[in-house]
Amino acid sequence: AKEQGMYLPVVYNTGGYERVETLKMLDGLVDIYLPDFKYLNTDHAKKYSMAEDYPEVAKAAIAEMVRQAGKPVFDERGMMKRGVIVRHLLLPGCLADGKRVVKYLHETYGNRIYMSLMSQYTPLESLDAAKYPELNRKVPEYAYEKLVDYAISLGVMQAFIQEGDTAKESFIPPFTLEGV
């Protein structure tokens, strides 16, 4: 298809917890990296992801992704052809850490990446409310607005933001593995 002029970028969607050695094997194969950057707070990383080293692993992984993909490139229709979009999902009660993530990404990468600041955290009935009561609620709209305002105050120009009312179960795909 490429030989006949058809081009579809290869997008690598990841939670951000990737070994640099693994990413190096993808060098030249991936056009757009779409990692999460969940936390800079190691206590949150340990508690919610059982990976206290998540912040350092994710930092190194994102650096490698940016090295490979370079600055964002768009076609004449505005579709991204190359680049990195780092997603950050604001969690309930984690605004301070969200601000630290945004600041780190902006100071480290500036306009070499896009950020996607997400507000759609949705508590699920299956979440152990006794174990994580602080996560058994949606992110208040004012908290998300504070995160967006903070990004703007830093000078972040390349970011996607969400409109309200995205924290619904209808936005969560069914993870049934049916058809796999």
Question: What are these language model-derived features?
Answer:
Residues 71-180:
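Auxiliary Fe-S-binding modules of radical SAM enzymes
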Residues 1-72, 161:
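Core AdoMet radical
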